[in-house]
Amino acid sequence: YWIGPIGLAENESEGTDFHAVKNGYVSITPIQTDMTAYHSMTALQQWLDKE
């Protein structure tokens, strides 16, 4: 899964993800994307409380 552009050849220096992939390795980067709509939490809680 990619979040952004693949990158250019100048980014393939040793120690980078691109270098690892180019040399047949798997590169795993732990990423956490928080897409919670915090601005909607109060309205959602009020809606749930009505149930």
Swiss-Prot record:
UniProt remark on cofactor binding: Binds 1 divalent metal cation per subunit.
* Any single GO CC term annotated in Swiss-Prot or TrEMBL for this entry: cytoplasm
UniProtKB keywords: Cytoplasm, Hydrolase, Metal-binding, Nucleotide-binding
Q: Which GO terms describe its molecular function?
A: 5'-nucleotidase activity; metal ion binding; nucleotide binding
Which InterPro entries does this entry report, sorted A to Z?
Answer: SurE-like_sf
Subcellular location field: Cytoplasm
Q: What cofactors are annotated for this protein? A: a divalent metal cation
The free-text function statement in the UniProt record for this protein reads: Nucleotidase that shows phosphatase activity on nucleoside 5'-monophosphates.
Protein known as = 5'-nucleotidase SurE
- Which Gene3D superfamilies does the record associate with it? Survival protein SurE-like phosphatase/nucleotidase
The record's EC number reads: 3.1.3.5
Reactions this protein catalyses: a ribonucleoside 5'-phosphate + H2O = a ribonucleoside + phosphate
Taxonomy of origin reads: Bacteria, Pseudomonadati, Pseudomonadota, Gammaproteobacteria, Pasteurellales
The UniProt family comment states: Belongs to the SurE nucleotidase family.
